[in-house]
Amino acid sequence: MLDFEKPLFEIKNKIESLKQSQEKNDVDLQDEIDLLEASLERETKKIYTNLKPWDRVQIARLQERPTTLDYIPYIFDSFIELHGDRNFRDDPAMIGGIGYLNGTPVTVIGQQRGKDTKDNIYRNFGMAHPEGYRKALRLMKQAEKFNRPIFTFIDTKGAYPGKAAEERGQSESIARNLVEMASLKVPVIAIVIGEGGSGGALGIGIANRIMMLENSTYSVISPEGAAALLWKDSSLAKMAAETMKITAKDLHHLNVIDSVIDEPLGGAHNNIEQQAIDIKQAFVDQLEQLQQQSADELVEDRFNKFRNIGAFIEK
């Protein structure tokens, strides 16, 4: 339960208590239950339409929030995962493969968090090593060779900062991806589904179109990290989140991303099937637009998109 959801938790407890009493004592409490359920829906709408940036950070970090592998079966047909960077080893924190989007062959790449402690250790908490980014690049170059559109799911706190990762060229692998992705001659569409952290997110994020789920975040550093750097106090993360403009709405307003996909009431984890349907429709719509462009136009479109980010006019 998140801090801002405490009022909802209290109502849910009352509903559950009434249901148990109704079953145990064989009394009709349905009217009271209906009233509480209506109250729960109203309160949920009230809370989720007035979320603060720090609230959205908490939602983006939820353990039960859907991951790349949760969405793939709903969006793509006949997905086959491919492994390895052909240089060192496979990286479970970065998954990728081929499949079909409404009959069109596509390449799918995404960061993958774990679902529990054991899985998180296996997936390295969604923080990819250099071999993960090199695997992603291998699949992207393969997609370009066979003229397959590329879809990437961004969901990471950042690239893994460990000693071994640095020894194997973490920064070089990300930088190489930025260079190579900028010149890919196929449509590239990215979506931030959870946290989009720093260079780890950018390593698969140089796309013609970038979308974000309503409660996802995208930033150069975590709010805790920013607070520690700016004010020498990581406990001021909530204040940092307000200042950093890391929410989907703020980034859309700043033209860093192209569109925001609404989430079901209470977050994507409350209705993954509906969320996947919305993502798939957005993918289809964006792909139809990009397929009207030539290979050279796709590259120019991508270059201009990133060239214009951060541009401003002094008056």
Curated annotation (Swiss-Prot):
Domain (CoA carboxyltransferase C-terminal): residue spans on this chain: 32-289
Catalysis performed (reactions): N(6)-carboxybiotinyl-L-lysyl-[protein] + acetyl-CoA = N(6)-biotinyl-L-lysyl-[protein] + malonyl-CoA
Protein's organism: Staphylococcus haemolyticus (strain JCSC1435)
Pathway listed: Lipid metabolism; malonyl-CoA biosynthesis; malonyl-CoA from acetyl-CoA: step 1/1
GO BP term, pick one: malonyl-CoA biosynthetic process
Primary location group: cytoplasm
InterPro entries per the UniProt record, alphabetical: Acetyl_CoA_COase_a_su, ClpP/crotonase-like_dom_sf, COA_CT_C
Cellular compartment(s): Cytoplasm
Regions annotated as coiled coil: none
Protein name, per record: Acetyl-coenzyme A carboxylase carboxyl transferase subunit alpha
GO cellular component term, pick one: acetyl-CoA carboxylase complex
Subunit-structure text: Acetyl-CoA carboxylase is a heterohexamer composed of biotin carboxyl carrier protein (AccB), biotin carboxylase (AccC) and two subunits each of ACCase subunit alpha (AccA) and ACCase subunit beta (AccD).
